[in-house]
Amino acid sequence: MIKLVATDMDGTFLDEAGQFDMERLKKLLHSYKEKGIYFAVASGRGLLSLEKHFADVKDEIIFIAENGSLVRFHGQDLYEATMPRDFYLSTFEKLKTSPYFDEKKMLLTGKKACYVLDTVDETYLMFSHHYNENIQKVASLEDITDEIFKFTTNFTEETVEVGEAWVNEHVPGVKAMTTGFESIDIVLDYVDKGVAIVELAKKLNLDMDQVMAFGDNLNDLHMMQVVGHPVAPENARPEILELAETVIGHHKDQSVIAYMEEL
């Protein structure tokens, strides 16, 4: 029997406008509580952004944020993986040697805030505000006093995959993954949604066969591999569709919540 349901956000749980039906979710969460089913949101977004999206029900949801770098439930951090200061500073120096990297299109997410350089591309900054809360400008990354979870950086549609490959080949200790929207997330090399959901299942004393996950993109790949019941919307990447036990309708038609209601 399914005891934990986790879903990606963009391209999966959210519709094309980046929205969902809150009243429908409230009814679902009430039903899940009676059935003893946990609900988790697993996203590359930061915790502050997720809590804002789900403000009305945030105490009833498990948040797997920052592409698996942080798991929070009832205000407690069940799992976290942050980059030491020297590590993220040296990682930045290495990234600057990439022919695909543009520091004006880079954001770091931390526990207290998100950070961009004060030379940030303003179009990129506007884009980033859609997915991140409390973005602060700094003159140098050395000015940051926060704990850092990940880098996010944008490429062009033509260079995002080769840029991701460059990071994975040339920058030690990190893992880059495409998140959609021509961007990649760069996290510690042992971090992803799959690792986080395995750790969460352990905390909840669940077997992975009791876990269902919905995802559409490559940052969902490991999560879809480790859960007992991977489900993908029809708009998912081919690599995700191949892993799926079940393929459902397009995310724009709220297919994920409809499927969840049938459990």
Name each region found by the language model.
Residues 57-59, 67, 170-172, 226-227, ...:
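Short, structured coil segments at secondary-structure junctions
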Residues 33, 96, 100, 168, ...:
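Anion (oxyanion) recognition and catalysis
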Residues 20-122:
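Active-site phosphate-binding/coordination module
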Residues 32, 67, 151, 224, ...:
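Residue-level signal for inorganic ion chemistry
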Residues 3-18:
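Asp-based phosphoryl-transfer active-site loop
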Residues 9, 45, 215-217:
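Active-site metal-binding loops of divalent metal-dependent hydrolases
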